[in-house]
Amino acid sequence: MTARQPSSRSCFVCGRENQAGLRARWESDRRAGEVRAEIAIPERFNGYPGVVHGGVVTALLDEAMARTALVEGGFEDLMVTARMEVAFRQPVPTATPVTVVARLRRKTGSRAQAEAELRLPDGSV
């Protein structure tokens, strides 16, 4: 069963009122232990023509991983990023529906480790 996650109005990634942002809608799946969003990233976020800027891809992955803490807990479990490593495997096309998926790997006190991936329509990462 999935549930829509709340968003912050002005957040660059999820803010519904941030006209300059991505306005991603996030859902939690408690059974799968995942957070996911489906989004077609507009061309204004190009790095090169037709390709999403790597910083925007990284922002989506960062947001997804931070939101994994909300699957079991609440806003008191919000996390901030201390360290993040991204491996870019292929370009992400703009204006194409993609799925961002994140899972919490481990949580100990105020520290957590999560992983995320961005899937293209053909299922590739």
Task: State where each predicted segment sits.
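Hydrophobic residues on conserved beta-strands that form the core of alpha/beta folds
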Residues: 23, 81-83, 113
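Short solvent-exposed loop/turn micro-motifs enriched in small/polar/acidic residues
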Residues: 19-20, 79, 109-111
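A conserved, well-ordered hydrophobic junction motif at loop->secondary-structure transitions
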Residues: 36-63, 71
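HotDog/MaoC-like acyl-thioester-processing domains
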Residues: 1-4, 92-94, 103-125
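Non-catalytic linker/capping segments at the edges of enzyme domains
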Residues: 1-44
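Hydrophobic beta-strand-centered segment that forms part of the acyl-chain substrate-binding groove
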Residues: 64-99
